[in-house]
From Swiss-Prot:
PANTHER family listed in its UniProt record: S-ADENOSYLMETHIONINE:TRNA RIBOSYLTRANSFERASE-ISOMERASE (PTHR30307:SF0)
A cellular component term, taken from the record's GO annotations: cytoplasm
Main location: cytoplasm
Organism field: Xanthomonas campestris pv. campestris (strain ATCC 33913 / DSM 3586 / NCPPB 528 / LMG 568 / P 25)
Cellular compartments annotated: Cytoplasm
Name used for this protein in its record: S-adenosylmethionine:tRNA ribosyltransferase-isomerase
Length: 356
């Protein structure tokens, strides 16, 4: 399977550059699990599309203002994108500069203080910050929000709120779990009234999510790593949902990535079952991989040739996904992080119950 198999042409004007005034006003393309016709709805219609006893699972990671600017001792300008906070005033980061900084060099930060380059960690750099407050708190004032590169404007004050889900609580992401951006408090209240339950995982979306696939042969692609936590309470929620015949719906590809990373085969469950897990994942989901943990997902429209497009193609089938994308383009849906969404049902009904 090749990267080029996942190419599609997207008119540039369909790339959303800003969010709508209301989160839940985004359009929602409903893609049924059979060749039935697509349905054009809005995200605010979800209470009508889900059933009492269903379980929506959100990613509760919180985006940090992870972009910094500074200057090397030589005078050269530097851009820093923090990929992960490591504790002890240290971080792993991407650095953009005319020449790669060497271990031991110091970057004077525009916001005050400095960062020492400790060395390399693969494609990233390890930095130690000399600043007047804990790094996590200092970034709230000093850092800039790292909007995706296809949003061709500087981040504004509104982005501090809108590029964050209303349920974000665990600090550590450098990009938003964008499917969750469509949910506001009013919609969550209506879903609760409908009898839909909520669960949460944490996956800290890393800077690797912005990196393109650089090889055409997908078996040569090295997937980036991200930290996640699937807790025992969520595992029990999923078990209860299955027992009562409810459906499990992931809000975003990061939730699917988390659940599939925590899916384990056991003697009692030869097809696998969800187990609690906290740690790193490097899982790469593409057609041929069978997603068993969820029945449906709410997800945005993804970039051509991206690993996220490959994941949703594994879930719903390549032909179905590309037909849905063609429909969305023809109907002028808005694409990517601030764009519209899909409600995507699995092509294999019942797989979440561990059926073979």
């Amino acid at each position: 399977m090749k990267k080029s198999d996942f190419h599609y042409d997207l008119p540039e004007e369909l790339i959303a550059q800003a969010p709508l005034a209301e989160r839940a006003a985004s359009r929602l393309l409903v893609v049924p699990p059979t060749p039935a016709a697509f349905s054009d709805r809005q995200v605010r219609d979800l209470p009508e599309l889900l059933q009492p006893g269903d379980l929506l699972i959100f990613n509760d990671t919180r985006v940090i203002p992870a972009r910094l600017f500074g200057q090397k001792a030589s005078g050269g300008r530097v851009e820093i994108l923090i990929e992960r906070l490591l504790g002890g005033q240290q971080a792993r980061a991407q650095i953009g500069a005319s020449k790669s900084p060497k271990a031991g060099s110091v970057i004077a930060l525009d916001a005050g203080g400095q960062a020492e380059v400790l060395g390399r960690d693969g494609e990233f750099y390890l930095l130690r910050f000399d600043i007047p407050a804990p790094l996590e708190h200092w970034l709230l004032d000093a850092g800039r929000l790292p909007l995706p590169p296809y949003i061709r404007r500087e981040p504004g004050l509104d982005d501090r709120e809108r590029y964050q889900t209303v349920f974000a609580r665990e600090v550590g992401a450098v990009a938003a779990p964008t499917a969750g951006l469509h949910f506001d408090e009013a919609l969550l209240a209506r879903l609760r009234e409908r009898g839909v339950e909520f669960g949460h995982v944490t996956l800290h979306v890393g800077a690797g999510t912005f990196q393109p696939v650089r090889v055409d042969a997908l078996d040569k692609h090295v997937m980036h790593t991200e930290w996640l936590n699937v807790g025992a309470a969520l595992v029990e929620q999923v078990r209860r949902t299955r027992a009562r015949g409810g459906r499990v719906i992931a809000v975003g590809t990061t939730v699917v990535r988390s659940l599939e990373s925590a899916w384990r085969k056991t003697d009692d469950a030869p097809h696998g079952e969800l187990q609690s897990f906290a740690g790193e994942t490097q899982i790469f989901i593409l057609p041929g991989y069978r997603i068993r943990s969820v029945d449906a997902m709410v997800t945005n429209f993804h970039l051509p040739e991206s690993t996220l497009l490959m994941m949703v193609s594994a879930f719903a089938g390549c032909d179905r996904i590309f037909a849905a994308y063609a429909h969305a383009i023809a109907q002028r849906y808005r694409f990517f992080s601030y764009g519209d969404a899909m409600l995507l049902w699995s092509r294999e009904w019942g797989i979440g119950n561990g059926e073979s």
